[in-house]
Design a protein with these regions (language model features):
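N-terminal, polar/charged subdomain of small-to-medium soluble alpha/beta proteins
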Residues: 1-88, 100, 104-148
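Short hinge/gating elements
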Residues: 88-96
Length: 148
């Protein structure tokens, strides 16, 4: 499972011209599910999202987690995180999980994170317009199976 985590002042998702989800200060996380991912990957990603210390404390140091800062989470599925462009010019998505299983694990991750923080979501397998105001900017790449 792969995530692009962005600290933000606000973020929102629009589907078919209608705002479907919006958060204030917190994180926008783009989440890709890989073939072979399991609930263990969901647990790992959720734990990192909730507890990663990328929010400033009273001294201006990145010392607080999403949970500690009272921030919100916008979790958006994005299979293109597994796009492979090493060969040719058009990305291949052979590593991305099939839609039914990917949606199941995406929803499981949403459910897990919702136990700790307010979570907004995009609509799975739709064309979305995602906007945010980066804070920092702070952007972290996270993979449940490897380091970048």
């Amino acid at each position: 499972m792969r995530a692009v985590i962005q600290r933000c002042n606000w973020a929102r998702v629009v589907n078919d011209g209608v705002e479907t989800s919006k958060i204030s200060k917190g994180m926008l996380v783009l989440l890709g599910v890989k073939k072979g991912d399991t609930e263990k990957d969901c647990e790992y990603i959720c734990n990192k999202i909730i507890n990663m210390r990328i929010f400033e404390d009273e001294n201006g140091k990145m010392n607080k987690s999403l949970l500690e800062s009272g921030g919100e989470l916008l979790l958006v599925s994005q299979f293109t995180l597994y796009g492979d462009v090493r060969h040719g010019r058009r990305p291949g998505f052979i590593e991305a999980e099939l839609p039914d299983r990917a949606n199941e694990l995406y929803e499981k991750t949403v459910e897990m994170c919702s136990k700790y923080v307010k979570v907004g979501t995009g609509k799975f397998q739709t064309d979305m317009k995602v906007s945010l105001e980066n804070d920092g900017p702070v952007t972290i790449l996270l993979d449940s199976q490897k380091m970048f």
